[in-house]
Amino acid sequence: MNTKFPEAYVNFLLESNGGTPEEDLAFDFIDIASNKKNSTDIREFYIFYPEGESSYDDIIKVNYIMKSEGLVPEECLVFADDSAGNPICMKTGGENQERIFLCDHELENANNGYLLMSKVADSFNEFIEKLYIIE
């Protein structure tokens, strides 16, 4: 994975390297399909495993599969998912760099064939700030 990550995401990885949040977390976003406010949770942040180790939540494996199947653009880093299986990604290049998107695994963008992407935040820091504990 030859990608330059934003400093906020690098710091997050150094502190936690992903995994399941200790508390049930959610965030709000505007659903691009309905143009209405919606919310979802964080099931898991994907993990960077040491070379030779892997699991279903291996960030390198997940990104390889998502990109080779044409589900997300090459300049997206899928770094988490929600409990419905919707990937959460960050643009790491090109237009909208560093923005965070929720990808609807059931809907396809008719223009490019990728999963339909709803903007969540303009940066990883903003994304983290938008998270709240589910009561």
Q: Where does each model-flagged region fall?
A:
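Compact, glycine/acidic-enriched structural inserts
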Residues: 104-132
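Broad, structure-driven detector of short, well-ordered beta-strand segments within folded domains
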Residues: 86-93
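A short alpha->loop->secondary-structure connector
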Residues: 95-100
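Pocket-edge structural micro-motifs
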Residues: 80-81, 92, 104
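A surface-exposed partner-binding patch
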Residues: 1-84, 132-135
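Aromatic side chains
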Residues: 5, 9-12, 63, 101, ...
